[in-house]
Amino acid sequence: VKDGNSEARAGFSKKLVNEMMAEHDPRVRAEILKCSAGFDNPSARAICVGGLDDPDSLVRIAACDAWVEIGGDEAIRHLANRFRSDEDIDVRLHAVRDLGSLENEAAIPVLAEALEAPDPAIQFRAVASLKEVSGRDLGNDVNAWREWAVDPSAYREEWSVAEVWRQIF
């Protein structure tokens, strides 16, 4: 169906919407989400948006992953909202990870916000995602990344002989 014409894809996506709404098994809903991410039409997009608010965390995680495939500023907005509002730590961690997977600098403010989270797992995941987005490696020091995130364009690393030796050994 993905290779078919746009009418066939739209019709299939509408069937997926009905399946998503009727399905009780979260594993099946998660698979429907994965399938929907590959279609660029309103019905498929509605499945991906709705999946973010599913009662089951497995489906919300699948929705986060679907937004990585979709990409763009809309994906950043939805993943940021999921990071900020979800009560399940696994979903929040996936949202932060997926923000990094987008490799879009527009995600930096949200990832900087994640550095301020009280949970060290969120902070660690935010550091890993900032490494992906920025292409830099400031180590795992959350404070160094906080400093960098304030103004990424102005940040420059201090060069020292000691730092060169540390990197060698």
Which residues does each PLM region occupy?
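Structural signature of alpha-helical solenoid repeat scaffolds
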Residues: 1-2, 37, 68, 100, ...
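TPR/TPR-like (Sel1-like) alpha-helical repeat modules
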Residues: 115-120, 131-134, 146-151
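Amphipathic alpha-helical scaffolding segments comprising HEAT/armadillo-like alpha-solenoid repeats
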Residues: 6-21, 41-53, 72-84, 104-116, ...
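Conserved hydrophobic register position within alpha-solenoid helical repeats
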Residues: 32, 63, 95, 126-130
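Short inter-helical turns and helix N-cap capping residues of alpha-solenoid HEAT/ARM repeat scaffolds
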Residues: 24-25, 55-56, 87-88, 118-119
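Pro/Ala/Gly-rich low-complexity, hydrophilic intrinsically disordered segments
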Residues: 138-169
